[in-house]
Design a protein with these regions (language model features):
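Active-site nucleotide/adenylate-binding loops and adjacent lid/helix of ATP-dependent enzymes
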Residues: 4-7, 12, 70-71, 78-159, ...
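Conserved N-proximal alpha/beta basic substrate-recognition cap immediately N-terminal to
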Residues: 7-104, 119
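C-terminal active-site "lid" helix and adjoining low-complexity regulatory extension at the edge
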Residues: 26, 212, 216, 225-275
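A short glycine-rich, hydrophobically flanked beta-strand micro-motif that places a catalytic Asp/Glu
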Residues: 41-42, 151, 216-228
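A short beta-strand motif that forms the metal-chelation/ATP-contact edge
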Residues: 51-55, 114, 162-164, 229-244
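Phosphate-binding site of ATP-dependent enzymes
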Residues: 128-214
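Asp-based, Mg2+/Mn2+-dependent phosphohydrolase catalytic module
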Residues: 268-278, 390, 394, 401-511
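N-terminal helical cap/lid subdomain that shapes the substrate entry/recognition surface
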Residues: 273-391, 414
């Protein structure tokens, strides 16, 4: 059973419904995955004997002290809430010590006087002061209420609200001053955003690093993008409402919870890999080595979103399925087609399908931009995979113990070559070549036979598809490592057939 702890109303000023919505969305997904869920109020919470994990929005000292005695996983951790998110001054000092940009104590553009410890429960807990005299008055007023004030300088630039789930691809950011959606009315002091250009990928990785330094799994915050493109972190919070992106966020949050429940002893896995325990390590390709565990349908959809393609997700999904079926039935992909050419052909089929159904839609306006986005993302993923193959599995590669097993079009070797992965595998078992497709367990047996391994228990299978990789490999007796990422459907398997679960290569690989 997983116990979900609701946030008390006093900790959800103007956000009570939104906080309830994200918790309920997450719980619904976990129920669909087969978990028993019990929801309790934080003011009534006590430890449950049969709990496998706690997912907690709690912020009260009473609930957090109780949770601190838990022997099962707690998301977010008590430490992240108690030490880092409830103490604004300590959080700022900690982030600065970790090398992240934070507001200075003094400045010439005004000040923010904030409740130093605990959470903002009303507008009087966060006050803008245009000058030092107003700052002194705001501090005095806060002190009179029995609240210790914390002061930092106002930072000019674009205000950005960001949301993430640590060590997953989920990261979103928004400009609240574009639409005026703010928790308190005093948040509009940065004015109309300029949308100053900055590196969005770098923001994603840096925000994830910020969250990890605070021990947060579910996180959000406020950041200022200065005119020079530098980012300054104003506040980082535990478990925000994810109001603009709660459906997507809930999917990744569910992945994180399932991983916590079925994580397995990851130290044992590292030890086995490093000590040469396995006679074979078998990798899936698509989704595992080239997209960080994310289903390729989702990766393409996110590229459509990033480029502003005027199509809704249901139509995109139809186009994606149509393209997959078309490529499966017709010899469109040739054996020497590399990744770029393969993807160009796939996208062309998708976009032509959309054009037939959307008036005024022209594929040529979108093809190159989508393709460039996907190539950039794939290069980033495969660069890390190359590093993992070289550093973590290097001895296995040298001894010819690494195998690729993939459902592909007959050109996987050309694709591997484009990304420098062609020397990583002694054998490649490709469905279009051998005539067997996943989830048939036989394709995994073919991989074992290819290098003369007779004992499946001495093989490790790594794949992103629970149904096509993990279950059949488990059935024949292999150890399995499930690379759990954003799936094609919101229903997430419970992971019980996986020996280990990861949401990032960094779960098993330490550079």
């Amino acid at each position: 059973m997983i116990v979900a702890i609701k946030r008390a109303k006093r900790f959800s000023p103007n956000s009570e419904d939104k906080d309830a919505r994200i918790l309920n969305s997450l719980c619904d997904l976990l129920r669909q995955s087969g978990f028993d869920i019990r929801i309790v109020d934080e003011d009534d919470f006590c430890l449950q004997k049969d709990a496998e994990a706690y997912i907690s929005m709690a912020r009260s000292d009473k609930a957090l002290v109780e949770l601190d005695a838990s022997k099962v996983p707690v998301i977010n951790t008590v430490r992240s809430v108690f030490e880092y998110c409830q103490n604004r001054e300590f959080q700022t000092v900690h982030l600065a010590a970790c090398g992240f940009n934070v507001p200075e104590p003094k400045g010439k553009d005004g000040y923010w006087v904030k409740k130093a410890y605990g959470y903002s429960e009303c507008e009087d807990d966060v006050v803008f002061a245009p000058d030092e005299e107003a700052c002194k008055a705001a501090k005095a007023a806060m002190s009179e209420r029995g609240v210790k004030p914390y002061v930092c300088a106002h930072v000019k630039g674009d205000l950005v609200k960001f949301y993430g789930v640590s060590d997953t691809p989920f990261f979103r950011f928004y400009y609240p001053d574009d639409d005026g959606e703010m928790k308190f009315s005093n948040n509009g002091h940065n004015g109309v955003p300029k949308h100053t250009p900055f590196d969005e990928y770098d923001f994603m990785y840096e925000a994830n690093a910020v969250a990890k330094s605070l021990d947060l799994d579910f996180y959000g915050g406020d950041c200022i993008i200065r005119d020079d493109g530098e980012r300054v972190y104003i506040d980082v919070n535990d478990w925000p409402s994810y109001s603009r992106c709660y459906k997507e966020a809930a999917e990744y949050m569910a992945i994180k919870v399932i991983k916590a429940v079925h994580h397995g002893n990851i130290d044992l896995l590292r030890e086995r890999i490093e000590n040469g325990y396995y006679e074979a390590v078998i990798f899936d390709y698509g989704g595992t080595l080239d997209s960080d565990g994310m289903h390729w349908g989702k990766r393409i959809w996110h590229a459509y979103q990033k480029n502003g393609v005027p199509v809704d997700e249901p139509l995109f999904r139809d186009a994606y399925v149509h393209a997959e079926r078309t490529l499966a039935k017709n010899p469109i992909i040739q054996g020497n087609d590399d990744f770029t050419e393969t993807l160009r052909k796939k996208l062309t089929i998708e976009l032509d399908y959309i054009q037939e159904r959307v008036e005024g839609f022209y594929p040529d306006e979108w093809l190159d931009d989508i393709l460039d986005t996907l190539i950039e993302a794939t290069e980033e993923s495969t660069n890390l995979s190359n590093e993992v193959m070289r550093e973590l599995f290097g001895d296995y590669v040298k001894k010819g113990k690494t195998i690729l097993v993939s459902n592909f079009y007959g050109n996987v070797n050309a694709v591997l070559s484009q990304f420098g992965l062609d020397d990583s595998f002694s054998q490649v078992i490709e469905s279009a070549v051998v005539g067997v497709r996943k989830p048939d367990p036989e394709i995994w047996r073919m991989g074992l036979r290819a290098i003369g391994v007779s004992d499946p228990s001495k093989a490790l299978v790594i794949g992103d598809s629970y149904d096509k990789d993990i279950i059949p490999a488990h059935e024949i007796g292999c150890d399995t490592l499930w690379f759990m990422g954003e799936g094609w459907t919101p229903v997430i398997p419970d992971g019980a057939k996986a020996n280990w679960v990861m949401t990032s290569w960094f779960d098993v690989y330490e550079p």
